Each structure stands twice: as structure tokens, then as C-alpha cells.
Design a protein with these regions (language model features):
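Divalent-metal-activated hydrolytic enzyme cores
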Residues: 1-31, 36-45, 67-79, 86-95, ...
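Short Gly/aromatic-enriched secondary-structure transition segments
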Residues: 46-54
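Short coil/loop linkers at secondary-structure junctions
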Residues: 55-56, 94
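A short beta-strand-loop structural module common to alpha/beta enzyme folds
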Residues: 57-67
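Donor-sugar nucleotide-binding helix/loop cap in glycosyltransferases
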Residues: 98
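Acidic/histidine-rich, metal-coordinating catalytic segments
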Residues: 101
Length: 165
């Protein structure tokens, strides 16, 4: 290098490089999926997204303990929404799929409720609030909600994901 020159790139060069990447990109992410990281639901969730919703290879996947509980907590809400915003903005997401499930430790598990109907009602209420919060922050998004359950039949796990309207 000549005297006074450095190997550092100027910020404008990086901006042009990334701008060109986004300008030339023709395929974008179809959805942002937000789900709990409970190991009992991992495989079933992937199968549901890939096969039943037809999203294989077309979504960003954010898995956090308790899923929407962090969005309900005013102390962590902004942090969570800002993290979601990165995916929404950079990958041009137009829809969000939020999955919650029965027996979630974030809610104290099923034992914290008198009946499974009470658990479903409480978590569904939070899912709907999450949809409202996402809609306030990201007005263009369509938000779809699902509640997952496990049934046991002859030692086999049977999963069901019910859409919450």
C-alpha cells in the first residue's frame, strides 16, 4: 500500500454490496415461524410446517423457550419484537406463523390449569394478543396462530395443530 493507504473498506462499499444483493434477489422467505423449543414438539412442528402447510425450505424459524410468553412480558417484548423485525425486514416476510402448545413450561405446564380447556383458553388468549402486538409493529403482516397438542395411543404420540382464528 502507498503511504497513508489501508486495507480497510469504506462503509459505502459494504452498503453497495449488500444493496446489490437485496436488489438482485428474486426469491424471498414465505413466512417467519415463531415456536417454543420444547423437544417433544420439534419433529412434529417441522412436519406440520413442511408437509401440512407446504413451507419446506421457505421460512425463517425462531424457536425460543415459552414461545409467546416472552412477547407477553413487557420487560422482554421490545427485544423480542425487534429480533422478529430483523427477519421481517431482511427477508421480506409477509406472514408470521406462531405456534404454542399444551403443557408448555412457560405457563407452568398443564398442571398449572384445572382442566385442559382452561389451558387452551389461556394460551389461545395469549396467541391472539401476540397477533395484535405483531399487527401493531408490522402492519403488513398476516399472522396465523396454531395450538399443538399430543395424544397417546398405544404408546404412539399423535400430534394435532389446531388453528386459532
Amino acid at each position: 500500500f502507498a503511504e497513508g493507504e489501508t486495507a480497510e473498506k469504506k462503509p459505502e462499499q459494504d452498503t453497495k454490496k449488500y444493496s446489490k444483493f437485496f436488489d438482485e434477489k428474486t426469491k424471498w422467505c414465505d413466512a417467519l415461524v415463531i415456536t417454543c423449543n420444547d423437544f417433544r414438539f420439534t419433529t412434529a412442528t417441522q412436519e406440520f410446517l413442511n408437509n401440512r402447510l407446504g413451507l419446506k425450505g421457505k421460512y425463517d424459524y425462531i424457536s425460543i423457550p415459552g414461545s409467546i410468553r416472552n412477547l407477553m412480558d413487557s420487560k422482554t417484548r421490545d427485544l423480542v419484537l425487534n429480533k422478529f423485525g430483523v427477519s421481517v425486514r431482511l427477508h421480506r416476510v409477509n406472514r408470521v406463523i406462531i405456534l404454542a402448545h399444551q403443557d408448555c413450561s412457560g405457563y407452568g405446564g398443564s398442571a398449572a390449569f384445572h382442566e385442559s380447556a382452561d389451558e387452551f383458553k389461556a394460551i389461545s388468549k395469549d396467541l391472539k394478543k401476540a397477533r395484535m402486538l405483531m399487527g401493531i409493529k408490522f402492519r403488513h403482516l398476516k399472522v396465523y396462530l396454531y395450538y399443538g397438542t399430543i395424544f397417546y395411543d398405544n404408546h404412539n404420540r399423535i400430534y394435532n395443530f389446531k388453528q386459532i382464528l
